[in-house]
Amino acid sequence: MAGVGVGPLQGMVRFGLLVLTVCAACARGLYFHIGETEKRCFIEEIPDETMVIGNYRTQMWDKQKEVFLPSTPGLGMHVEVKDPDGKVVLSRQYGSEGRFTFTSHTPGDHQICLHSNSTRMALFAGGKLRVHLDIQVGEHANNYPEIAAKDKLTELQLRARQLLDQVEQIQKEQDYQRYREERFRLTSESTNQRVLWWSIAQTVILILTGIWQMRHLKSFFEAKKLV
């Protein structure tokens, strides 16, 4: 009987680990410092047809108080997003704090870059700028209270909607993993094929070199009348 229960239990554990992995990968919260002309970029692995929401706010370094304070409204941030093919998905100027959204149409590494317009702002005065950035991917980007109010969903219906969105996100993650595995397989096959042809080329070169040396030695010995 114990052997019968191990399979389903392992399946549940694996599914739970996958859910935790997906949930951990769906939200990014961090802060970083940038200078006047510095651009900071991040790479985010995103499945296709997935919504991404980024929220940020900026703080400026006060030299007198030696503390970071909320930035003035005049200071802005430029956000640029590129897909795995290098195409610009989003390029827009925002304020000192804001929110940007985009939907991926190609699976893979998306580049998210931010830089300030401080080169035009005298108030920056060569100081530091702290940027708090929170990136939410997939179903974590949904505002469920707003959805519940708009669609007039009960608590049970809202929970069912959340579970369906989570399952959909897991399916997208699995599709993306299969896509990566397929790319890795093609790369491995291409590499193995190149190694094989290079080995064949080396063998042919070695054989031709040996034949040439034998003929050269034969000609040498014949010239010396040793054979």
Swiss-Prot record:
Glycans are attached at residue 117. GO terms for biological process: protein transport. The chain crosses the membrane at residues 195-212. This is Transmembrane emp24 domain-containing protein 4. It comes from Mus musculus (Mouse). A motif (COPII vesicle coat-binding) lies at residues 220-221. Residues 39-137 form the GOLD domain. It is found in: Endoplasmic reticulum membrane. Residues 213-227 are cytoplasmic. The keyword Transmembrane helix applies. Residues 147-176 form a coiled coil. Its main location: endoplasmic reticulum. Induction: By brefeldin A, oxidative stress and heat shock, but not by tunicamycin, hypersomotic stress or serum starvation. SMART domains: EMP24_GP25L.
